[in-house]
Curated annotation (Swiss-Prot):
PROSITE patterns hit by this protein: RIBOSOMAL_S3AE
Keywords attached to this entry: Ribonucleoprotein, Ribosomal protein
Top-level lineage group: Archaea
GO cellular component: cytosol; ribonucleoprotein complex; ribosome
Gene Ontology molecular-function annotations: structural constituent of ribosome
Family: Belongs to the eukaryotic ribosomal protein eS1 family.
One GO BP annotation of this record: translation
Protein name: Small ribosomal subunit protein eS1
S-S pairs: none
PANTHER family per record: 40S RIBOSOMAL PROTEIN S3A
């Protein structure tokens, strides 16, 4: 009886191993706004199974900038060519440890959470936080929040999807918010701490974006 079970167990192990042998390891690359950099690998026995998968990496690994270690970036695979998968920005967040380290007593935290549409029709939820140098009153906090929302909406309206992503992650948006809000009250820090792609542009526009991304990513890898 024990021998029979052992034989069945061996057959199961062989079957599992055979399934893995059938899988192909696809290389995941970011879209051109991130330089078409390599993100990682994902296994599948059919390229259609790769589409829609979400890969995670740190902004530090993407940019080579050690000061960006606190941000995690998510990419969703939307195209496969050969054994290469192209992944589009899908969102980002910030580590809880970093967020806690920035919040201090006797400071005010002002949050702005907006769903905006970029110039080319992509909808993104953006979450930003302003930390004041010391405690602000109710009106000052209200004025700061209004200014934050005004800046985020304006940037979305004037920028394409890749440009808006860069503004969020590489400091342009935070710097703009800080420079404008410090006219209202002294500001300690501004963090664009989270974002999420809610929907893409209509199909024909998105297909053009996919084709362009595939071509530019291929050029970046040459």
């Amino acid at each position: 009886m024990a021998t029979a079970r052992t034989a069945r167990s061996r057959r199961k192990v062989r079957k599992v191993r055979d399934k893995w042998k059938e899988k192909v390891w696809y290389e995941i690359y970011a879209t051109p706004e991130f330089g078409g950099v390599f993100i990682g690998y994902t296994p599948a026995n059919d390229p259609s199974l790769v589409l829609g998968r979400v890969a995670e990496t740190s902004l530090r690994d993407l940019t080579g900038d050690p000061t960006k270690h606190m941000h995690r970036v998510y990419f969703k695979i939307f195209g496969v060519t050969g054994n290469k998968a192209i992944a589009q920005y899908y969102g980002h967040d910030t580590t809880r440890e970093f967020m806690k380290s920035q919040i201090r007593r006797r400071r005010s935290r002002i949050d702005a959470i907006l769903d905006v549409k970029t110039q080319d029709g992509h909808k993104i939820r953006t979450k930003a936080m302003v930390l004041t140098a010391y405690r602000a009153n109710t009106k000052q906090k209200s004025d700061i929040r209004k200014k934050m929302e005004e800046i985020i909406k304006a940037m979305a309206k004037e920028k394409t999807f890749p440009q808006y992503v860069q503004a969020m992650l590489f400091g342009e948006m935070a710097e703009k918010i800080k420079n404008e809000c410090k006219k209202i009250f002294p500001i300690k820090n501004v963090i664009i701490y989270k974002s999420e792609v809610l929907s893409l542009a209509k199909k024909e526009e998105n297909e053009g974006f996919v084709k362009e991304a595939e071509e530019e990513t291929a050029e970046a890898q040459e």
